[in-house]
Amino acid sequence: MYRNVCVIAALFCIAAAATAETYIQQDSIARNKQDYAYLVAYTEANYAAFPAIMQAGYGAPYQAMKDSFGAKIGRGEWGIKQAACEYVYWFNAHFDAHFYVDEYLFWQVYKRRDTPDYKHLMNYAPQAVSQRVNRKTWLLRVPSCAGQNPTNEWVAQAVETFLQSGCKHLIIDLRGNSGGSDMIWIPLLPLLIDHQANMPETYWFRNTYANRYSPAMQDWLLAQIANNEDPAPMFLQVGAEDDEEDEAIPAHDARIHISFIIDRKTASSAETILRVARNYTDRDRYTIYGKENSAGAAETGNLFPFHLPNSRIQVFYPTTVSSVFLRDGQQNGAAGIAPDVRIELPYPDTLTDNVDSWVLYIAKRPASPNHLKEGAQQSGQK
């Protein structure tokens, strides 16, 4: 009898444990579904580029993607971390690299699909550099736009030193620069502006309660939208459109040729200076060099974070979007800015505070209109 009771008790414990495990699993799925629903709803309501993407005709594939991922969560095939990464990467890969999940899985698995792991290809730790390369060429390496390494003051002094050097070829190295603030480029603007904008544009803030009252709201942005009374439009203009025909072109030396070096980590504010050149600089005065395109985070900005309620996964999304994005949907926006000349050399062994092999290669090339034709041919061969 005692043995039977023990056996029954043991079986009861096993059954209870199995039942508890089932309940935990079901509870986990329920929480994952809640988090996924929150991610979807928050994105649709607040992500600045979302309306443009839908208006560009991507509603059907988006709905199919959203439903498919939700079903996989419901069946227990995916956890919330994978689902969140898959959902956000759909936008990140096709439209806008500014939308991302702040998780190791996102950066080391999903972004590896389109971004080389440079630290495994070379000694990759770009540092600020301002120095002469040869008699005619100056190198300005700017690894960040965050205003710390380098500072805005350092960049201003570097530009002044270059202008005093007599060099007529400026290499602006943007490899590894994932952005920060556009303010860092102000000292360089007079060197780049040859004419009025080829394509006037402005930025628009997606005017939602969550965006307006986010703790991440910056004072300068709040000042531009604060005077709009509720109910306000879905989008509020941030700054004036850059098509002022009476705005004077700054005096500068038009003999200076500017070469940019980019990689797939060149993003956001680092892409801004490339867009300035493409919009304002005479075409024979600049060249973009690289092996890969830039990151594709050029036409949105002002990132805010939010957390999924159960898992606390953090997602960053842009609250402003360019009028260029709104005009055409930019279905290839995440492809980034393509180099004019794709560098066929191997990656350098070291990219730190040195003059690397790519810089030496560019310094020896003639800065003439012929580089554009040659660059187009090289790009087409890739």
Each PLM stretch: what is its role?
Residues 322-348:
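A recognition module on extended beta-rich or small alphabeta surfaces enriched in W/G with H and D/E
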Residues 215-245:
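Aspartyl protease catalytic domain
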